[in-house]
């Protein structure tokens, strides 16, 4: 049977007080609905039906290039009505898994357990036990077997005492699901077509109904307002921090890091507070990351150090290299083994060779820097002529004095020395000393200007 996933994402989310459709609000820098879509892909779904309504243009702008079947729910008439809009895309032999675009923390392992709990041609529903089930549909059982789900507003006094609640997530056989959806009625307190009513229909038809539960109730919580969104964010971050610690990272304070992507760490990694990881980040063994650092789509080699408040984006930091504090590696930058950039050094589309150093206040862009090079404070590779970018090549063992400008395209030969304050516009041969600074003048008898009285 093919796995066909239906994701309900048509709601406006009025309580968010936002023009953005609710499901596009982010958890860990990714929209809630994208989390759910990614989970569906990880399950091996053969098709994903996205039921949408409010904010269609914004949804399609964000998600439109993905392999989704877009299903319009023009009127929001309940969850049963929403799923029914996808009937034409559901095969009789499909296993249909129903998920929610505002429930982003559901785990693949939980859904695998739900699918495994389902009997052939049976219905499986995900439930959870809550100390306070107020507001949720209750699971009604007879002799231990599920016979139906009753919504809060339709429940009697005895049913309101039930702590096992419906999460809304279920797996059903395609043929029977379409038949049950066709029998739904809106004759209830809400005047809506409840998806939950199909459970009683399944029981009446003698269909096997099984249940599964998540490891944690937070997996099935949704976000209807920004307070709940923040709570889900914290839960996501706590889970991410726990994963990093289990992989071998020491977190100075697990409550004060932000993971916004896929992070892989080696052993004995030390991560200080308020560090942000975004995109795909790979960190080797014995790495130290200082407070306030931001790492985006980058690779950090063994024994490297990222000092406080440095930004590493689409860059590579090699083994035993270091950056910061207050350093910035922009896309295409690479520090080779044992290289170092210090405070207020920026690199872009440039390589700093093994053992080379730029200690402070420098810009290195569109450059190839060899091994054993020292770049003095205030050095700039002048890579842009107003129309095009040009390359600066600095070969091994070059000494660049402070406040030097290298006007690209230019090549500095091996072992050359550039005097402080020089502006280099032509290639420099190996082992040459080049000084271009203006001759110093001494003017005697000079008087400073005096401020005029107003």
Swiss-Prot record:
Binds 1 Mg(2+) ion per subunit. InterPro entries: Bifunctional_GlmU, GlmU-like, GlmU_C_LbH, Hexapep, Hexapep_transf_CS, MobA-like_NTP_Trfase, Nucleotide-diphossugar_trans, Trimer_LpxA-like_sf. The keyword Transport does not apply. Residues 1-226 are annotated as: Pyrophosphorylase. Residues 227-247 are annotated as: Linker. It is found in: Cytoplasm. It comes from Shewanella loihica (strain ATCC BAA-1088 / PV-4). HAMAP family: GlmU. Its main location: cytoplasm. This is Bifunctional protein GlmU. Keywords: Acyltransferase, Cell shape, Cell wall biogenesis/degradation, Cytoplasm, Magnesium, Metal-binding, Multifunctional enzyme, Nucleotidyltransferase, Peptidoglycan synthesis, Repeat, Transferase. Catalyzes the last two sequential reactions in the de novo biosynthetic pathway for UDP-N-acetylglucosamine (UDP-GlcNAc). The C-terminal domain catalyzes the transfer of acetyl group from acetyl coenzyme A to glucosamine-1-phosphate (GlcN-1-P) to produce N-acetylglucosamine-1-phosphate (GlcNAc-1-P), which is converted into UDP-GlcNAc by the transfer of uridine 5-monophosphate (from uridine 5-triphosphate), a reaction catalyzed by the N-terminal domain. In the N-terminal section; belongs to the N-acetylglucosamine-1-phosphate uridyltransferase family. One of its GO terms (biological process) is cell morphogenesis. Acetyl-CoA binds at residues 377, 383-384, 402, 420, 437. Gene3D superfamilies: Hexapeptide repeat proteins (2.160.10.10), Spore Coat Polysaccharide Biosynthesis Protein SpsA, Chain A (3.90.550.10). It holds the Pfam family NTP_transf_3. Mg(2+) binds at residues 102, 224. Residues 248-454 are annotated as: N-acetyltransferase. The lineage of its organism: Bacteria, Pseudomonadati, Pseudomonadota, Gammaproteobacteria, Alteromonadales. Disulfide bonds: none annotated. Coiled coil: none annotated. Its cofactor is Mg(2+). The active site is at 360 (proton acceptor). GO terms for molecular function: glucosamine-1-phosphate N-acetyltransferase activity; magnesium ion binding; UDP-N-acetylglucosamine diphosphorylase activity. One of its GO terms (cellular component) is cytoplasm. PANTHER family: BIFUNCTIONAL PROTEIN GLMU, NUCLEOTIDYL TRANSFERASE. Its EC number is 2.7.7.23, 2.3.1.157.
């Amino acid at each position: 049977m093919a796995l066909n996933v239906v994701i309900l994402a048509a709601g406006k989310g009025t309580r968010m007080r936002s023009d953005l459709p609710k499901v596009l609000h982010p958890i860990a820098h990714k929209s809630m609905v994208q989390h759910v879509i990614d989970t569906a892909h990880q399950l091996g779904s053969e098709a994903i039906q996205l039921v949408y309504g409010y904010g269609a243009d914004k949804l399609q702008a964000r998600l439109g290039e993905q392999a989704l079947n877009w299903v319009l729910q023009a009127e929001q008439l309940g969850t049963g009505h929403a799923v029914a809009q996808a009937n034409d895309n559901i095969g009789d032999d499909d296993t249909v898994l129903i998920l929610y675009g505002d429930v982003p923390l559901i785990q693949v392992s939980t859904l695998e357990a739900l699918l495994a709990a389902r009997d052939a041609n049976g219905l499986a529903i995900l439930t959870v036990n809550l100390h306070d089930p107020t507001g949720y549909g209750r699971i009604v059982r007879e002799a231990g077997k599920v016979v139906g789900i009753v919504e809060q507003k339709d429940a009697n006094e005895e049913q309101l005492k039930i702590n096992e609640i419906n999460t809304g997530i279920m797996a059903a056989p395609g043929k029977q699901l379409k038949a049950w959806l066709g029998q739904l009625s809106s004759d209830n307190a809400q005047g809506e077509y409840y998806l939950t009513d199909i459970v009683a229909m399944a029981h009446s038809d003698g269909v096997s109904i099984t249940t599964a539960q998540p490891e944690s109730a937070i997996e099935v919580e949704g976000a209807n307002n920004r307070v709940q969104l923040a709570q889900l964010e914290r839960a996501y971050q706590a889970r991410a921090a726990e994963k990093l610690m289990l992989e071998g990272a020491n977190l100075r304070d697990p409550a004060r890091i932000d993971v916004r992507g896929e992070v892989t760490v080696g052993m004995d990694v030390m991560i200080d507070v308020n560090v942000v990881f975004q995109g795909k980040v790979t960190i080797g063994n014995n790495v130290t990351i200082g407070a306030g650092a931001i790492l985006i789509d980058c690779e950090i080699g063994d024994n490297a150090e990222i000092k406080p408040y440095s930004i590493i984006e689409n860059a590579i930091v090699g083994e035993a290299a270091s950056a910061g504090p207050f350093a910035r590696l922009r896309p295409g930058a690479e520090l080779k083994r044992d290289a170092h950039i210090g405070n207020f050094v920026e690199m872009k589309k440039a390589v700093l060779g093994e053992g080379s150093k730029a200690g402070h206040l420098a810009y290195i862009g569109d450059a190839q820097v060899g091994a054993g090079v020292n770049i003095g404070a205030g050095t700039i590779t002048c890579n842009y002529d107003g129309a095009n970018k040009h390359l600066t090549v600095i070969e091994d063992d070059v000494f660049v004095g402070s406040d030097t400008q290298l006007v690209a395209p230019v090549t500095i030969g091996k072992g050359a020395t550039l005097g402080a304050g020089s502006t280099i516009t032509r290639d420099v041969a190996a082992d040459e000393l080049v000084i271009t600074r203006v001759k110093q003048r001494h003017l005697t008898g000079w008087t400073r200007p005096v401020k005029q009285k107003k």
